Amino acid sequence: MPKRILVGTVVSDKTDKTVVVKVERKVKHPLYGKIIRRSKKYHAHDEANAFKTGETVRIEETAPISKLKTWKVIDRVQAGKGTAIEADV
């Protein structure tokens, strides 16, 4: 069976070697037919602590690393929008 690969946004990078990735999907409401956004958070392994909050990343399913971590970050899809810029004042 192939490994699942998902794309999501890093919402937390506070723990060591771990990031929390929020993956959104769109589903159709069974009765009303409206398209609704559903989301789920995954704990993913980040060996080098390279990924920061706000970045869009690709995660891959792996064998369990810890109680919560069964995903690892493969690569960065898009840089975060909240990057700090230094200014001379």
Swiss-Prot record:
Q: Name one GO molecular function term.
A: rRNA binding
Q: InterPro entries of this UniProt entry?
A: NA-bd_OB-fold, Ribosomal_uS17, Ribosomal_uS17_bact/chlr
Q: Which UniProt keywords apply?
A: Ribonucleoprotein, Ribosomal protein, RNA-binding, rRNA-binding
Return the Gene3D superfamilies for the record: Nucleic acid-binding proteins
Q: What does this protein do?
A: One of the primary rRNA binding proteins, it binds specifically to the 5'-end of 16S ribosomal RNA.
Family per similarity comment: Belongs to the universal ribosomal protein uS17 family.
Subunit comment: Part of the 30S ribosomal subunit.
**How is this protein named in the record?**
Small ribosomal subunit protein uS17
Native species of this protein? Novosphingobium aromaticivorans (strain ATCC 700278 / DSM 12444 / CCUG 56034 / CIP 105152 / NBRC 16084 / F199)
Q: Which gene encodes it?
A: rpsQ
